[in-house]
């Protein structure tokens, strides 16, 4: 007699009963927490002698939560079926308190201000990031399924620091790793249909802005931040087309400004600026025309560390566009003397001939045989034409950036770079 089916069915029914029980208990607990929060809010307002207004007007708020996600939020999200897969007990849809992580909360009129028990302590925030990197990301090295989850939860970490105005060394260390997470994501997820790279770049710039403010505070207090040069370099390269980035660098203390990684970042910044202006007044060919070519060589050089290269990769389409335009201006096209496509691919760090063809086609520049038709003209006018939409990266670059990536993402996020690039002596 086969008893497998009845046994399996009984186990399924038990699981359903447990889930119904948990839901009932969860709703009861949630209602208790709602009532407790109302009392707690009134108590805090009374203690602060604030009869009208907000808690933020009463006093600086200090978080007391030692869980990665406050209990109230966890119970509320459970009732709304808003628990993410990395937060669930395996094989269930129930929130695991040891895995659930507080979400980012947008500021909006009508939203309640957080209570102290809604805000995590600095140690808890650091432990939360440890969990995100060493557990969640470690289980998904390609970041495909976990990226959106981690991006939201790291925003929440930064938000808790900001609300409490915590600006200590823990904040610095946490923000540094969050910045590295965004840089790694820009490379690994490039071309993924569900990845909006501009959103990660926005969050990276926000994080770097916070770090620069924190570094300034620590420097005024004569506290040394060991990774300051590394993250100033990232700030410079994340603002390649912004002249203000150079002015920020020029105001740095000498030992930071002269650090090899900062100098390498400034070199990339200078080359990207120079690459944007086509030069029509020389006949010396592409080598003297456009520093965009040198930009890719600099990214590939051993002196450019991994994450700096990942960040520079974000600008590859615009640098290539400028280089292509400059070469079209410099070369008078002659049929049968097209520019070798393999040389073109190497020069602008393309991974394949197909990638070259796809890129050039966006600008109305064609290929003939094994060559690129640089400088082709119709009725005396160059055929180069900018597309309606700016070209985007379609896959991670392997030729120069991928060649540097010899470690799992979690190590790139956690580890400092090679000390010879960060030296400030």
Describe the function of each predicted region.
Residues 1-168, 178, 184-187:
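N-terminal alpha-helical interaction modules that lie
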Residues 135-142, 163-164, 191-197, 305-310, ...:
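Short interface patches used for recognition in eukaryotic signaling and trafficking proteins
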Residues 140, 184-193, 219, 241-244:
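Short coil/turn linking the two alpha-helices of tandem helical-hairpin repeats
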Residues 170-173:
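Structured, charged N-terminal subsegments at the starts of enzyme catalytic cores
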Residues 177, 186, 193-200:
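Non-catalytic protein-protein interaction scaffold segments in large eukaryotic complex-forming proteins
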Residues 177-179, 184-186, 234-241:
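Conserved small-residue packing positions in alpha-helical repeats and bundles
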Residues 197-359, 363-369:
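Alpha-helical scaffold segments of alpha-solenoid architecture
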Residues 376-425:
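Acidic, serine/threonine-rich low-complexity intrinsically disordered linkers/hinges in large eukaryotic
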């Amino acid at each position: 007699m086969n008893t497998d089916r009845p046994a399996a069915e009984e186990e399924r029914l038990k699981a359903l009963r447990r889930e119904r029980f948990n839901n009932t208990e969860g709703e009861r607990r949630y209602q208790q927490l709602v009532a407790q929060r109302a009392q707690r809010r009134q108590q805090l307002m009374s203690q602060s002698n604030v009869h009208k207004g907000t808690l933020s007007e009463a006093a600086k708020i200090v978080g007391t939560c030692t869980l990665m996600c406050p209990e109230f939020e966890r119970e509320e999200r459970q009732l709304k079926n808003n628990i993410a897969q990395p937060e669930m007990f395996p094989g269930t849809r129930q929130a695991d308190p040891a895995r659930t992580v507080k979400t980012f909360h947008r500021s909006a009129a009508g939203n309640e201000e957080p209570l102290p028990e809604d805000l995590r302590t600095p140690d808890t925030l650091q432990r939360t990031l440890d969990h995100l990197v060493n557990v969640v990301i470690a289980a998904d090295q390609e970041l495909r399924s976990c990226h959106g989850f981690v991006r939201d939860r790291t925003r929440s970490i930064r938000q808790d620091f900001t609300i409490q105005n915590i600006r200590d060394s823990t904040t610095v260390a946490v923000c540094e790793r969050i910045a590295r997470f965004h840089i790694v994501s820009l490379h690994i997820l490039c071309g993924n249909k569900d990845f909006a790279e501009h959103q990660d770049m926005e969050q990276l710039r926000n994080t770097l802005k916070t770090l620069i403010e924190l570094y300034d505070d620590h420097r005024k207090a004569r506290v040394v931040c060991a990774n300051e040069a590394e993250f100033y370099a990232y700030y410079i390269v994340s603002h390649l087309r912004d002249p203000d980035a150079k002015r920020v660098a020029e105001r740095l203390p000498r030992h930071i400004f002269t650090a090899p990684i900062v100098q390498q970042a400034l070199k990339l910044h200078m080359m990207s600026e120079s690459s944007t202006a086509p030069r029509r007044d020389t006949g010396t060919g592409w080598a003297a025309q456009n520093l965009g070519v040198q930009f890719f060589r600099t990214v590939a050089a051993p002196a450019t560390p991994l994450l700096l290269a990942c960040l520079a990769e974000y600008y590859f389409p615009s640098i290539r566009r400028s280089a292509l335009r400059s070469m079209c201006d410099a070369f008078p096209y002659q049929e049968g003397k097209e520019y070798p496509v393999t040389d073109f691919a190497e020069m602008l760090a393309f991974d394949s001939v197909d990638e070259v063809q796809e890129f050039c086609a966006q600008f109305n520049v064609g290929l003939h045989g094994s060559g690129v038709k640089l400088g082709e003209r119709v009725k005396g006018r160059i055929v180069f034409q900018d597309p309606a939409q700016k070209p985007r990266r379609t896959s991670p670059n392997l030729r120069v950036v991928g060649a540097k990536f010899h470690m799992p993402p979690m190590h790139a996020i956690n580890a400092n770079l090679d000390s010879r690039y960060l030296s400030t002596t």
